[in-house]
């Protein structure tokens, strides 16, 4: 039996030696599938619909009623959830070398790969060879704007495959200028905790991206910038947001606003951030404080016949009546807007303070300037004027028709508490009418910010309850500055209007929020 086993094993061994060996299977040929995309310059690291920067985040409780005063992570190159804008105004870092572009070899097959990049000037650069693995198949490079040819070479042993794609590297430089309706006043990053947990005499610490200006990425321009960023992987968006609560044309946009700690005009602040880069898009909200927004509210809260009364304080002090002051200040707006236009790609720029005499900011070919009309905060859900606290419905109607309506009649009939009719001539038009008229400057007025609330059958004013798009009086609720400003719903409506006015149009889905 043992002899048979030995003989059998010998026969098997001889058979194995005598059979020809199967040829080794040839390695699969490599395939090159080059792809590219712009790395976002307006980042949303947690998908909550708001930009996250690199300016630091509270060490604890960022979105609570009272976040930690200690900030962490500033300048580490990582956008943390709920992290402030860089310097309170910049979405991400600008680099003279260009903008970050992701080169994607992940759908390719092979062992190793390199990219060869031929730039707009014809210069060629080849990246270091890397292993083609899931963790290493992506490469980020800095490239200047313009047309590039990207060639991906993939190798396996001595075999290789190369394919090229054209890449139009493009970063949209967006600048937000203006007042509280642009800065996001009343909408700090932790606004939701204030809305749900705050109350009468509550203790609340707003978490702003910029404290002096009450600036927040919950403001409409920042929301629109993020929507623009997310609209295409082939462009990135850098936001420079210098809007500041309380700003006017002279004290804010074109000059220092020392009352809010701004030693330089917004124009000069932008210049120092972007240098000689060309701007692609400007959003602008200004004029409300120029015509006496705060003075009107103060007067009408204390005087039942405020339009014919003497302004108690503020920018309209010295005018014989509130109506006369509003009309006189409205008449100054066309020249004020023209001065701003001079600084945005015009022939001369007249700013005061630091930067006086500097050249205008450079605008890119086809750049858009989007001034926003102010929303209607005066009407109840029924469409009737609000009768709010000590402000009479008649005075709400007067404010709406003589300040906000963009196509007013030539006169306005006002009825006093004594039932005495007074006819007001509107020779200077209205604030929103003057903003709409900036088409003459080559601007594109954002009318949707008005029409959504002002032309609708349903009112969304300060007395509209759950349908309101603006805060009422918040003086006793821990954030007095929010009074009579757009609430989160109102900022979203303005952001939607801004995005819709962009070319090409950008749509913000409510599901994104």
Model regions: which residues?
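Secretory targeting and sorting signals
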Residues: 1-28
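Beta-strand-enriched, solvent-exposed domains that form extended recognition/catalytic surfaces
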Residues: 29-173
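Mobile, glycine-rich extracellular loop/lid and propeptide segments
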Residues: 94-108, 116-119, 161-190, 217, ...
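Short amphipathic alpha-helices and their capping/turn segments at secondary-structure boundaries
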Residues: 163-176, 261-282, 336-368
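Conserved SGNH/GDSL esterase-like catalytic core that processes O-acyl groups on lipids
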Residues: 196-331
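A structural motif corresponding to the C-terminal end of an alpha-helix
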Residues: 220-237, 329-370, 407-448
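Alpha/beta-hydrolase-fold catalytic nucleophile elbow
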Residues: 285, 372-373
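Catalytic His-Asp segment of secreted/periplasmic serine-dependent ester chemistry enzymes
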Residues: 374-508
């Amino acid at each position: 039996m043992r002899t048979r086993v030995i003989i059998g094993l010998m026969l098997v061994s001889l058979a194995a030696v005598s059979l020809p060996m199967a040829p080794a299977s040839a390695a699969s040929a490599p395939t090159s599938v080059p792809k590219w995309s712009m790395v976002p310059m307006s980042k949303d690291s947690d998908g909550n619909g708001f930009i996250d920067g690199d300016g630091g985040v509270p060490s604890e409780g960022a979105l609570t009623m009272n976040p930690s005063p200690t900030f962490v992570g500033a300048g580490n190159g990582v956008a943390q959830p709920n992290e402030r804008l860089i310097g309170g105004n910049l979405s991400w870092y600008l680099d003279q070398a260009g903008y970050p572009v992701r080169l994607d070899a992940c759908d390719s097959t092979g062992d190793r790969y390199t990219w060869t990049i031929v730039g707009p000037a014809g210069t060629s650069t080849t990246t270091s060879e890397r292993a083609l693995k899931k963790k290493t198949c992506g490469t980020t490079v800095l490239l200047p704007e313009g047309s590039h040819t990207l060639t991906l070479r993939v190798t396996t042993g001595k075999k290789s495959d190369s394919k090229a794609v054209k890449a139009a590297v493009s970063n949209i430089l967006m600048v937000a200028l203006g007042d509280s309706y642009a800065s996001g006043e009343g909408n700090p990053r932790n606004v939701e905790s204030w809305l749900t947990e705050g109350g009468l005499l509550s203790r609340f610490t707003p978490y702003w991206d910029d404290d002096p200006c009450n600036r927040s990425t919950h403001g409409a321009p920042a929301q629109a910038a993020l929507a623009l960023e997310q609209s295409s992987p082939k462009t990135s968006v850098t936001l420079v947001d210098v809007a500041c609560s309380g700003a006017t044309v002279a004290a804010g946009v074109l000059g220092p606003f020392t009352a809010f700690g701004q030693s330089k005009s917004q124009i000069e602040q932008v210049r120092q951030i972007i240098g000689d880069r060309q701007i692609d898009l400007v959003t602008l909200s200004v004029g409300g404080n120029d015509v006496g927004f705060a003075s009107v509210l103060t007067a009408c809260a204390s005087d039942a016949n405020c339009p014919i009364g003497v302004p108690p304080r503020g920018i309209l002090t010295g005018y014989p009546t509130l109506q006369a002051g509003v009309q006189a200040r409205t008449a100054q707006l066309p020249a004020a807007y023209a001065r701003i236009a001079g600084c945005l790609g015009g022939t001369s720029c007249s700013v005061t303070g630091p930067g006086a005499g500097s050249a205008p900011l450079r605008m890119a070919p086809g750049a858009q300037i989007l001034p926003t009309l102010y929303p209607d905060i005066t009407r109840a859900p029924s469409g009737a004027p609000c009768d709010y606290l000590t402000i009479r419905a008649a005075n709400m109607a007067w404010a709406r028709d003589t300040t906000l309506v963009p196509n007013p009649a030539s006169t306005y009939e006002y009825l006093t508490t004594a039932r005495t009719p007074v006819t007001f001539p509107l020779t200077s038009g209205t604030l929103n009418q003057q903003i709409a008229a900036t088409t003459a400057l080559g601007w594109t007025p954002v009318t949707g910010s008005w029409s959504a609330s002002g032309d609708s059958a349903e009112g969304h004013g300060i007395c509209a309850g759950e349908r309101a798009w603006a805060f009422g009086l918040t003086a006793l609720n821990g954030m007095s500055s929010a009074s009579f400003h757009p609430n989160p719903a109102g900022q979203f409506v303005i952001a939607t209007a801004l995005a819709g006015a962009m070319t090409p149009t950008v749509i913000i889905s409510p599901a994104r929020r």
